[in-house]
Amino acid sequence: MKRRQAELFGALGENYGALPEGFVFQPDFISSDEERALLEEIARLPLEAAKYKQYTARRRIAYFGFGYDFTANRLGAAPPAPAFLGPLRDKVAAWMSLAPAALEQALVTEYRPGTPLGWHRDAPDFGRVAGVSLGGWARMRLRRYPRGKDTPIVLELAPRSAYQMQGAARWQWQHSMLPTRMLRYSITFRTRERS
């Protein structure tokens, strides 16, 4: 337990204990063997440049279950998730106390060195969100939305760590990624938000 607390304190630095309500962070969510197997499979995926309206990002992505059309601001069709994502989806769903089928979208993202991700909240068509980090480290920032005067929280996402967002963390906070220093991948799972 003390090792886990030390890892979390190191991940948050001076912001220890400052995570928003509904944000859960877990170091070493998967093993190095699981990470290696996932990276081998991801290397075979046909990743494409991420597009946001008329902007082409430096990230490369592959959507499964549902895509998202940022020009039309709506969900789009995407192929079913490949079999290799099944065990990870099951593990994430159990951690979130959900049935695996509730995680209807999977997104694989490649961050090459120097790739950022700007401030945003995930599209409102989605509900709960979980992400698993692979490869390199990342620095995730969190800030209230609408933006207040608080200093953003910075969280170090180590390889093999995971986070989940629901409630206030999902709807009342934005997140971003600082430019990566080394090649990194993330696998994001999302539930659908049904009104």
Regions found by a protein language model. Give the residues of each.
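Non-heme Fe(II) oxygenase metal-center motifs and adjacent flexible, charged/small-residue loops
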Residues: 1-195
